[in-house]
Amino acid sequence: MSDIIIAFILGIVEGLAEFLPISSTGHLILVGHLLGFEGERAKTFEIVIQLGAILAIAILYHKRLVSLCNIKPLLRKEKKFNAFHVFLGVFPAVVAGLLLHDVIKTYLFQPYTVVIGLVAGAILMILAEVKKQEATACSLDDLTYRQALTIGFFQCLAVYPGFSRAGSTISGGLLAKVNYKTASEFSFLIALPVMVGATSLDLLKSWKYLSVDDIPMFAVGFITSFIVAMLAVVTFLKLLEKIGLKPFAYYRILLAILFTLFVLL
């Protein structure tokens, strides 16, 4: 199979899975294994296509991101969504990521740990659905600092491969009395700085594995991931309010079984 076709397939996988509660890491490892695309070059490729997904969110939410640069609501102590909400949602994961980055990359990016993350994340999502109460935050402007910080702590779970950033943060939002749409949008916004920081750090360390010959493949993967992520996020927001997290949780358990059969055994 040609590199361009592999790039196209993995770009679709990344674009679909990055902001859905199904674990992009688990999918990329499984599909990469089935395609025979593994090793350091594959890891560097995954970093590049993540940037495509990040760009999609930056464009979809560019107005909200620009509004965060306005510090007047923060200075006036207005009850309105502002940069401090994002800071509270990001800070715990940044600390966890910096402290555990090398340990995670060295020891936790293994197939069996991803299976554990898939199942553990599924259990959390089911529990969140069962335990959720009537939402008090039905828009980003309703979000309290305490709710933002709670979701931020749940994002720390996503440093474990296979757990899923969207799965952990949306679950945390439901448990903190935030509705589906608001929890999802906040999840996307706080993912941006964390992902930009993590992918930049990874790219600096993986730069030596890139060559000029890789540019066409990496470009196809990046563009595909960007387009698919744009479509996936818009569709997901509409779908989540109708079906909730449980179908995604059951899918994760199925993926863990497939992962075990095709990768571990």
Swiss-Prot record:
Its EC number is 3.6.1.27. It catalyses: di-trans,octa-cis-undecaprenyl diphosphate + H2O = di-trans,octa-cis-undecaprenyl phosphate + phosphate + H(+). It comes from the Bacteria. InterPro entries: UppP. Keywords: Antibiotic resistance, Cell membrane, Cell shape, Cell wall biogenesis/degradation, Hydrolase, Membrane, Peptidoglycan synthesis, Transmembrane, Transmembrane helix. GO terms for cellular component: plasma membrane. It is found in: Cell membrane. The chain crosses the membrane at residues 4-24, 42-62, 84-104, 108-128, 184-204, 217-237, 245-265. GO terms for molecular function: undecaprenyl-diphosphatase activity. GO terms for biological process: cell wall organization; peptidoglycan biosynthetic process; regulation of cell shape; response to antibiotic. Pfam families: BacA. It is an enzyme of class 3 (hydrolase). The keyword Cell membrane applies. It is a multi-pass membrane protein. Bacitracin is thought to be involved in the inhibition of peptidoglycan synthesis by sequestering undecaprenyl diphosphate, thereby reducing the pool of lipid carrier available. NCBIfam families: PRK00281.1-1, PRK00281.1-2, PRK00281.1-4, undec_PP_bacA. Catalyzes the dephosphorylation of undecaprenyl diphosphate (UPP). Confers resistance to bacitracin. Belongs to the UppP family. This is Undecaprenyl-diphosphatase 1. It comes from Bacillus cereus (strain ZK / E33L). The gene is uppP1.
